[in-house]
UniProtKB/Swiss-Prot annotation:
Span list, region Disordered: 173-192
UniProtKB keywords: Ribonucleoprotein, Ribosomal protein, RNA-binding, rRNA-binding
GO BP field: translation
Listed name of the protein: Large ribosomal subunit protein bL9
Record bears the keyword rRNA-binding: yes
Coiled coil: none
Entry-linked HAMAP family: Ribosomal_bL9
Cellular component annotations (GO), alphabetically ordered: ribonucleoprotein complex; ribosome
Any single Pfam family the record assigns to this protein: Ribosomal_L9_C
Family of the protein in this entry: Belongs to the bacterial ribosomal protein bL9 family.
Biased composition (Acidic residues): 179-192
Organism superkingdom: Bacteria
Length: 192
């Protein structure tokens, strides 16, 4: 099916272009969301008459997205989750969780604007891409940790997945030489 794009769609085309797409993509996504019109003579004339208002509306949306992007770009957010000693989460951090964290900070971002290839399943610092507008993409950093204190340590660059990092190094721990002394058992060094 041929459609006229009413806004820029990534990997498809710019506003005003007539592109050929699969019927299901047009019927289920582009047409219901108002991102495109069927390509026929009446709709082409309608698009040309409304082009100025569509471009103004698109420019307004882009400027709003750019304002949010200027505030969010490169910012770090802390996500506290339960995890095992190896740093493996007992669940995962998905796009829904990213939206909740951003909403708690006062940013209204939709789930479809968060681009995670796979859910986050380990503690650490993770980059997350947000597409606020077809022409505005930014990256934020998620600091996934077991607690706020661990998040601070992680932000400083400490490794938190080893047992020593979690529990600390015990200086008073017993060593094997404390239990076994070859001289005390009456063995010569040659026999041992």
């Amino acid at each position: 099916m041929e459609v006229i794009l009413l806004e820029r769609i990534s990997k498809l085309g710019q506003m005003g272009e007539t592109v050929k797409v699969r019927d299901g993509f047009a019927r289920n996504y582009l047409l219901p969301l108002g991102k495109a019109l069927r390509a026929n003579a009446a709709n082409k004339a309608r698009f040309e008459s409304e082009r100025a208002t569509l471009e103004a509306r698109n420019l307004e949306r882009k400027s709003e997205a750019q304002k949010v992007a200027d505030v969010l770009d490169g910012k770090s957010f802390i996500v506290v989750r339960s995890a095992g000693e190896t740093g493996q989460l007992y669940g995962s951090v998905a796009a829904r969780d990213v939206v909740e964290v951003l909403a708690a900070e006062g940013f209204n971002i939709g789930r479809n604007q968060v681009h995670l290839n796979t859910p986050i399943k380990a503690i650490g610092l993770h980059k997350v891409e947000l597409q606020l507008h077809a022409e505005v993409e930014i990256n934020i950093e998620l600091n996934v940790a077991r607690s706020a204190e661990e998040a601070e340590r992680q932000a400083k660059g400490e490794e938190l997945t080893s047992v020593d990092a979690i529990y600390g190094v015990d200086e008073d721990a017993l060593r094997p030489e404390d239990f076994f002394d070859p001289e005390a058992d009456g063995l010569d060094e040659n026999e041992a």
